[in-house]
Amino acid sequence: MKALDQLTFDNRFARLGDAFSTQVLPEPIADPRLVVASESAMALLDLDPAQAELPVFAELFSGHKLWEEADPRAMVYSGHQFGSYNPRLGDGRGLLLAEVLNDVGEHWDLHLKGAGQTPYSRMGDGRAVLRSSIREFLASEALHALGIATSRALCVIGSSTPVWRETRESAAMLTRLAQSHVRFGHFEYFYYTKQPEQQRVLIDHVLEQHYPECRDAEQPYLAMFRTIVERNAELIARWQAYGFCHGVMNTDNMSILGITFDFGPYAFLDDFDANFICNHSDDRGRYSYANQVPIAHWNLSALAQALTTVIEVEPLKEALGLFLPLYQAHYLDLMRRRLGLTTAEDDDMALVERLLQCMQRGGVDYSLFFRKLGEQPVAEALKVARDDFIDLAGFDAWGADYLARCRREPGNAEGRRERMHAVNPLYVLRNYLAQKAIEAAEAGDYSEVRRLHQVLTRPFEEQPGMQAYAERPPEWGKHLEISCSS
């Protein structure tokens, strides 16, 4: 493992030039202190976890110090926000500090969020608050532990620097890791500003660095787009299967790698509600839980439009046509596993849909239902789960069909509990748990953030003394309004 001064840098994106980003130095925050760090994220950089306790760690990730090899850059891009095109966005408070090359040949972006004003800040102050920084840290690491593709969070650094949102809050900086920070909106920017040469440079960069397996295809650009469609189909299937709501699926928040990116007012479902809206600014429900599938397709269509400079329209349409069937296949596979099924039958999707309809009629905690279902043999588990449902007749009919379906599975029930517990988390990042940790951190106590982080890194394992993190949320905890303010 390495010390901070032993990291190897290779700043590939910065070398593309000033048409793609602007060099900006971070603006330090006062009295930097470590709030929380992820050992597993540090391992991606080959960093010794003990480095997080050193004063220089907080200094480097709060803008007070820079590596000599760093080349901090604010990236330019545009995007569709709530369906309307915004021609010039860019990193308004984030900087791509550098790209680290680890010992297995992987490049990881070090991205500092809350680093101060940039040419793309518009009217913003360039800062991030402690509240939103903790939320992104916890979500990144929780999704990773669930097996959902995501950017990672290295650390959160707190400060005494005041910032104003709805009230006075304190500034913080989050260091995000990803193998690329290129978004759908990067391609839209060069397309709509009619810069085909720069767009081709960017496309070639992404192809060479992130989709090398597509280089030898008959049509490399089309092969890359098709792979992006495939990755997003699997990503959204995992979101839906685990009840994750992103909240702000603008095209500038969509990663070219097909990973969860740019967390805002996200939430995991508590009681199942297909129409759940986690962003209180989304008054029309554009980014509701149920709409995430069609919106992902819409965003891919926006990306396809931006790529019409290098790919013919008809092949792009054909590639887009892969999204829904791929999504459905991934989603059904995940839901079969969540139900403990190891084989496929034609009526399995109908079985899943009927269950969700029963849940929708009220009162059923989405995550805990699947966990309970695997605790005991099927007939006994159904009796226990029944108490949570309002539509008892509907659930009884579903339960009878589910029991019959389980009896058609090959072999005996040996290992069913272990199989189901391996895919059905006991611990999920509920908004009220995050809020309690944030309130403690805002009072200067970081122990709850760190404890919650540790619990969420092992979501499928029962952890002694952590039962409180596996409970149904209190009523007040189910209806927390989360805004884009960060």
Swiss-Prot record:
Binding site for Mg(2+): N253, D262
Source species of the chain: Pseudomonas putida (strain ATCC 700007 / DSM 6899 / JCM 31910 / BCRC 17059 / LMG 24140 / F1)
Cofactor: Mg(2+); Mn(2+)
GO terms assigned for molecular function: AMPylase activity; ATP binding; magnesium ion binding
Keyword Nucleotide-binding part of the UniProt annotation: yes
Annotated EC: 2.7.7.-, 2.7.7.108
InterPro entries: SelO
Catalytic activities: L-seryl-[protein] + ATP = 3-O-(5'-adenylyl)-L-seryl-[protein] + diphosphate; L-threonyl-[protein] + ATP = 3-O-(5'-adenylyl)-L-threonyl-[protein] + diphosphate; L-tyrosyl-[protein] + ATP = O-(5'-adenylyl)-L-tyrosyl-[protein] + diphosphate; L-histidyl-[protein] + UTP = N(tele)-(5'-uridylyl)-L-histidyl-[protein] + diphosphate
Family (UniProt): Belongs to the SELO family.
Function: Nucleotidyltransferase involved in the post-translational modification of proteins. It can catalyze the addition of adenosine monophosphate (AMP) or uridine monophosphate (UMP) to a protein, resulting in modifications known as AMPylation and UMPylation.
Cited Pfam families: SelO (PF02696)
Family matches, as HAMAP family: YdiU_SelO
Keywords: ATP-binding, Magnesium, Manganese, Metal-binding, Nucleotide-binding, Nucleotidyltransferase, Transferase
Residues that bind ATP: G90, G92, R93, K113, D125, G126, R176, R183, D262
Protein known as: Protein nucleotidyltransferase YdiU
The keyword Glycoprotein belongs to this UniProt entry's keyword annotation: no
Active site: D252 (proton acceptor)
